[in-house]
C-alpha cells in the first residue's frame, strides 16, 4: 500500500502532514490516495468543461467530488472510486477531445510557495463546494460560482506564477462570499429568518434520533417523516442552529441538542440508545459500542454502515429509533462548561433588529468591544484557549460566535448588556456571512471601515470550510485576525510573511496576553 500525504486539516501530524499508513483523522492511506486521484479527475473534468460545454450534471459532480474529500466526510474507498468513475464518464461526454487527469503528487512536490498557494485555492474550493452543494439541494445555484470552480481547478493543474496564484487565492475568497450569500438565501428562503431561541441539552425519555452535520434539508425531511411517530429529534454539533429557523422550530418533536463538539462524539455516543444520522462532516471512525446505530447520507460514507440514498427514505433510521427505545427516563446532559441550555438564532436580521440600540450602547461606552470567537472545534488541548479567552472578556464586550467552535463557550452565562446577551450565536460556519453583514452594517452606522470598528476576530480552524471563510475575510481586507490553535501546515513561510505584513494575521498565544493587547490597541 502506497503511503499517503495529506496536510489539509489542523490536526495533521506534527503540523507538517500525515504521511504514513493512516491520517490523524482516521482516514487510511489508500482512501487518501483515492481521494487525491478523485481531485486529479476533477481537474481533468475542469479542463474538459473549459474547452467544452458543462451541464448542470457536470456542475453537480464537481461539487460532489470536492465535498467528498473534505476532512471527516468519506472513509469509504468504494464510494470514492464510484464518484471518480462518474467524473471520468462525464469528462468523456463534456470535452471535445482527450483531457488528462492531474497527478496531485506534482502539487505536493512543487516549490513550497506554489504548493502553499495552490493548496489554499484547493482547500478553499472544497469548503465552498460544501456550501454550493447545500444551496443546490434547496434549488439555488449561481452560474458565476459554478464557472469559478472550473477556472480554479484548471489553474491548480497548470503552470502559474506566485502572483497569479495569489490573485486566484483572493478571488476564491470573493466567490465564496457570493456562495455563502447564495446558501443564506436558500436557507432563509426555505425556512425563514432565524430567531433567538433557548435550546435544552436534556434528552427526554423515549425514542429519539440524533442528527449531525449541516444539511437543513435532510433534517426537514426527517422531521416530516417522523411526525406523529412518537420519536423526538435532537440536533448535534453544527446542526444546532436549525432550532432558530421558524419552519424547523415549529415541529414540536424537534426537542433540543445532544452533546457538544464533534470531537467528543466517540465518548458521547457510547452505548447511545438511539440512531445517529450524519448528513455531512464531522464523522469520526465509528466505535463498536454504537456502530449499528450510525447512518450516513449524501456524500458521507463509511464502510459497513447503512447509507440512506438519494430517495431520502429514512425508514431504517426510524425503525432503529423505535427498536432502541431511547432512555427510560429524562437524561440530563450539559455543555462543555456545565450549562444545561444554549442559545442560538442570532443571525444578521435578529442582531440588526437591535442595531440602533447597539450603536447607542457603543456611543454611551456601555459596549467597549466586539469579538467574533468561533470557527471549527477540534480535539487539541490548546483549544481551551477559546474558552479561557471568552471567560476573560470584560462585561462591557459582546461576543459573536458561530460554527462548532461555539461549543467552547456557548453554555456559559456571561450575562447581558441592557437585555442583549453577551454571547450571540450567529449559526453554522457558513453563517460567517451573517457575521460579515453585521460587521458591515455597524461600520456603515459609524461611518467607518470594518477595520476601524472595535471588533476583533479570534478564529479557530480545523477543516476546509474554515479555509474558504478565511479567504473571504482576506478578500474583504479584514486585518488583525487571530488564528489558531495552530497555523495551517500548508502555509509556507513566505506566504505567511505576506499574510502577517498585509493583514496582520496573528497566531493565537496566551489568552490573557492576547486580550490585553487587543483592548490596549483601541
Model regions and ranges:
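Anaerobic metallocofactor- and corrinoid-dependent redox/one-carbon enzyme cores
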Residues: 2-31, 35-36, 43-44, 171-522
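Electropositive, gly/pro-rich neighborhoods at or near active sites that engage anionic ligands
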Residues: 39-190
Amino acid at each position: 500500500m502506497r503511503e499517503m500525504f495529506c496536510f489539509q486539516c489542523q490536526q495533521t501530524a506534527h503540523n507538517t502532514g500525515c504521511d504514513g499508513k493512516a491520517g490523524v483523522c482516521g482516514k487510511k492511506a489508500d482512501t487518501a490516495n483515492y481521494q487525491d486521484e478523485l481531485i486529479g479527475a476533477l481537474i481533468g473534468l475542469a479542463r474538459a468543461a473549459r474547452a467544452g460545454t458543462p451541464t448542470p450534471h457536470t456542475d453537480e459532480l464537481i461539487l460532489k467530488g470536492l465535498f467528498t474529500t473534505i476532512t471527516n466526510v468519506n472513509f469509504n474507498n468504494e464510494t470514492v472510486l464510484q464518484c471518480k468513475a462518474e467524473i471520468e464518464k462525464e469528462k468523456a461526454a463534456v470535452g471535445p477531445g482527450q483531457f488528462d487527469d492531474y497527478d496531485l503528487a506534482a502539487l505536493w512536490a512543487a516549490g513550497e510557495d506554489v504548493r502553499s498557494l495552490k493548496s489554499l485555492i484547493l482547500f478553499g474550493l472544497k469548503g465552498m463546494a460544501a456550501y454550493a452543494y447545500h444551496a443546490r439541494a434547496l434549488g439555488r445555484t449561481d452560474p458565476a460560482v459554478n464557472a469559478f470552480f472550473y477556472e480554479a481547478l484548471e489553474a491548480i493543474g497548470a503552470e502559474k506564477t506566485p502572483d497569479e496564484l495569489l490573485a486566484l487565492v483572493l478571488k476564491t475568497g470573493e466567490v465564496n462570499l457570493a456562495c455563502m450569500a447564495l446558501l443564506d438565501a436558500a436557507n432563509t428562503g426555505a425556512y425563514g429568518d432565524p430567531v433567538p431561541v433557548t435550546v435544552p441539552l436534556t434528552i427526554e425519555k423515549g425514542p429519539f434520533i440524533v442528527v449531525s452535520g449541516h444539511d437543513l434539508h435532510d433534517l426537514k425531511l426527517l422531521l416530516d417523516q417522523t411526525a406523529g411517530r412518537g420519536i423526538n429529534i435532537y440536533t448535534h454539533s453544527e446542526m444546532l442552529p436549525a432550532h432558530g429557523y421558524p419552519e424547523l422550530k415549529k415541529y414540536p418533536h424537534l426537542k433540543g441538542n445532544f452533546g457538544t463538539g464533534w470531537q467528543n462524539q466517540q465518548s458521547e455516543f457510547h452505548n447511545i440508545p438511539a440512531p445517529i444520522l450524519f448528513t455531512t462532516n464531522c464523522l469520526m471512525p465509528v466505535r463498536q459500542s454504537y456502530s449499528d446505530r450510525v447512518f450516513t447520507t449524501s456524500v458521507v460514507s463509511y464502510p459497513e454502515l447503512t447509507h440512506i440514498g438519494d430517495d431520502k427514505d429514512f425508514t431504517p433510521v426510524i425503525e432503529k429509533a423505535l427498536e432502541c427505545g431511547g432512555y427510560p427516563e429524562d437524561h440530563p446532559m450539559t455543555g462543555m462548561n456545565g450549562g444545561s441550555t444554549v442559545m442560538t438564532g442570532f443571525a444578521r436580521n435578529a442582531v440588526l433588529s437591535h442595531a440602533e440600540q447597539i450603536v447607542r450602547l457603543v456611543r454611551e461606552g456601555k459596549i467597549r468591544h466586539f469579538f467574533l470567537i468561533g470557527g471549527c472545534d477540534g480535539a487539541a488541548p490548546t483549544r481551551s484557549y477559546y474558552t479561557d479567552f471568552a471567560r476573560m472578556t470584560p462585561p462591557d464586550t459582546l461576543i459573536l460566535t458561530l460554527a462548532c467552535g461555539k461549543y467552547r463557550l456557548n453554555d456559559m452565562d456571561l450575562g447581558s448588556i441592557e437585555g442583549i446577551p453577551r454571547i450571540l450565536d450567529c449559526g453554522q460556519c457558513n453563517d460567517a456571512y451573517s457575521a460579515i453583514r453585521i460587521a458591515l452594517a455597524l461600520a456603515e452606522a459609524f461611518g467607518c471601515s470594518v477595520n476601524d470598528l472595535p471588533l476583533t476576530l479570534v478564529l479557530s480552524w480545523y477543516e476546509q470550510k474554515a479555509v474558504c471563510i478565511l479567504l473571504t475575510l482576506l478578500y474583504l481586507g479584514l486585518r488583525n485576525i487571530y488564528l489558531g490553535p495552530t497555523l495551517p501546515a500548508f502555509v509556507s513561510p513566505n506566504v505567511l510573511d505576506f499574510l502577517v505584513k498585509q493583514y496582520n494575521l496573528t497566531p493565537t498565544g496566551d489568552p490573557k496576553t492576547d486580550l490585553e493587547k487587543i483592548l490596549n490597541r483601541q
